[in-house]
């Protein structure tokens, strides 16, 4: 089916969206314009939807809100938001009753006429996706960037040409239901994550593996040789597999002990050519190089490495005040991301603002690293978390620190705040000239904010307001 045929088929169809997001609006507007009757279902009350709810009503969508939002699903097609569990009993019942249960990204994959590069993993997805997109743009390609990053892609599907490329970031929530794989699949790494939603680690890993399981012999898979869970996925690949490594020579991109980056035997550039800091960003570049090798030149790879400034909320420099440098690493939504990001960068102890919603992942290793790397730990936990998020991660982080074998009483100093303004104030009072302060939550922000980006924006505003 072509994109035009898909949109023509919507006339007279009843379509429901489960889970409200501003990203739904362009698609709902298009569906309405093509004669579909659209409803939107969300567990939150209509009042809690705020501006999003008002915008949906203006488009003519019927709102079904509250605890019974999944009752009586009898539409022709259901679009599941990524945050809505695929295996909800109500969705399984809908499937059994003949409802087509799908998602924006699944339909995009079904209709996309061009080559698709897709990136998943526990950490490094957005930077790797962005670097791939930048390299392909620099090589002269028209790039459609989306998924978990950028804008929704399905609303622009009719503008996508066969000679273009699509570059998408995919989460486990999106992948769990997908039955098509991209032309180029990248798994950056795998570690415990989102275990508050997935029933166990096996389900999480199996969801991630969907990015490669449906490839054919002409596909390409890129895997991290330094991460055991990721490297093991090589047993399930069907096309060409490239491994990347920061520790040893591989058939893909790898970095030598003296800081030179190669693809197989071919020299590309120096590790120091990469503008954005951190060993984890070297890994992100190795993954990106392995994904685009043969599609872009070495010159393009080097140029992007030297010029790309990175992505917002990823160890983003905010300002320097009174000799103290402030960074925003709000994207560090897991212990592993915190450890390979902010906590890997400095050979001196920093001031760290952490905390958020508990994803039911272990914090033991993070506790040890905090004891080694942090002088003051400011733990952020709201007095009243947002609906549905009862357990802040702050308590588990503190327990992991105090229970670490290398913890000494008072080192690190542990402080508590229930809002970002107070967290920034406490961090400033603790920091001395020459120090670094970083928002490095090691947890999602959903107990207080709509997203990690909103959390990072508020942190940035508070830091910039300091006098």
Annotate each PLM feature.
Residues 1-103, 107:
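N-terminal leader/targeting and accessory segments in enzymes
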Residues 3-14, 24-34, 142, 271-376:
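Nucleotide phosphate-binding/pyrophosphate-handling subdomain across enzymes
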Residues 178-181, 211-217, 235-237, 344-346, ...:
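Short, conserved loop/helix-junction motifs that constitute active-site signature segments
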Residues 53-61, 364-435:
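C-terminal helical cap/extension that packs against the catalytic core
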Residues 70-75, 82-225, 229-240, 429, ...:
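Phosphate-binding loop of NTP-binding sites
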Residues 31, 78, 101, 119, ...:
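Residue-level signal for inorganic ion chemistry
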Residues 42-43, 64-67, 102-106, 238-256, ...:
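Beta-strand->loop->alpha-helix junctions that form or flank phosphate-binding loops
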Residues 37-44, 221-225, 351-354, 373-383, ...:
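Short internal beta-strands
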